[in-house]
């Protein structure tokens, strides 16, 4: 009796499954992953410096627990007492990739997660009944080389894009209650939840303009999810304090601090070159909206405003190239959906012509972007850059001793190879500036070679026993050569290490 019931249940489930949809999704995911793999195999290097940090911290979480102590940046707002992992759930997702070689695991992340994001894009387009949604979804590889370069990184942006598309899909389908748990997850995933709140606010406002009836339920569910994600958090209340410190400097024009390159805007022509097809698809979508005799759909209006929002952010900061091209493609596809559907109904022969035209556009654009992404990966920093210098420090320094690094963005690779020592600053220079502005300015002056006999200051103020620097800090190296408190003890083709002599105390 029980056996017949179980068999009947499985039979019913198999009947309910839309097998063409499932098989198409599996096939598309394999294509997406395969195309991403063609980029990753172009070089053994990782696409960005931050990749080293994320995969290493995930390994530490696997070995020491989901909230391990973080002693490695004691002179920043990420000191051990105040530490907050603002990519907490992302690092949890990385844990399965930390078994075995970490570098290879990081590369698999840069294949699997973007493929999942693009699959979500296809699900979204399929849900909007876009003709040839599968071909449109291949356009994610065509619209922007910079977009691809961002998503192959072992960083949160691919999962963030997936989650934003999923939550917009849920909102457009009217399943508002799902926004609460999804917003909760997103808040644990990434501290960019203001993007989510803005996106849902755009949806609510647009629906109000269309229906003349204000329904705040989507925004309330999303806000509750974000609020609960902040409060029911393993790092509360440190997370709230950190978010204030992290976001505020980016909103202010603080030219005194050189933050990461991704926070600065592109020149207009650079956007045209690296995301020209995304801009073309966006304006083609506008043309489609103007071409229709009937009023635009709610879905098209929402996507237009969201894409415009990310476009404005892109001209403020180049890091938003991880969102604008993807949403531009989705907007263009949804904007053209009614016209294409009508055309295919009136001219059935077009069903054979249209996919051919799409392929003729996609193939060269995809090939161009893949080749560009492969070349960019080959030009990235060698994954072995600080391997030997870090090994030397592990062997010759005491556990927990401080190392004065002369470049904040070297921290990630140093951390990857050497958690034996702790460092001055890393990930973002504002983390030390927010902790102690004067200390940051002193660190910067030393690294620029503006402080004579800096070894004494490095020992007394920063408490460091060693200094590690790349070989491009010429002015610092010139000062170090004549500094009686610094003794060079190691050098290779990438780095030099100095011992801070005990007499500097």
Model-derived features with residue positions:
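Membrane-proximal, lumen/periplasm-facing interface regions of secretory-pathway glyco-
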Residues: 345-396, 408-412, 427-431, 444-453, ...
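Membrane-interface alpha helices of multi-pass inner-membrane proteins
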Residues: 144-147, 165-170, 177-192, 200, ...
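Membrane-interface helix-loop-helix junctions at transmembrane boundaries of multi-pass membrane enzymes
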Residues: 211-220, 284-306
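Membrane-interface transmembrane helices that cradle and orient dolichyl/undecaprenyl
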Residues: 164-178, 286-295
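Juxtamembrane membrane-water interface segments that cap and precede transmembrane helices
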Residues: 71-75, 85-96, 241-276
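Short periplasmic/luminal acceptor-recognition loop of GT-C membrane glycosyltransferases, typified by
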Residues: 395-437, 460, 464-472, 498
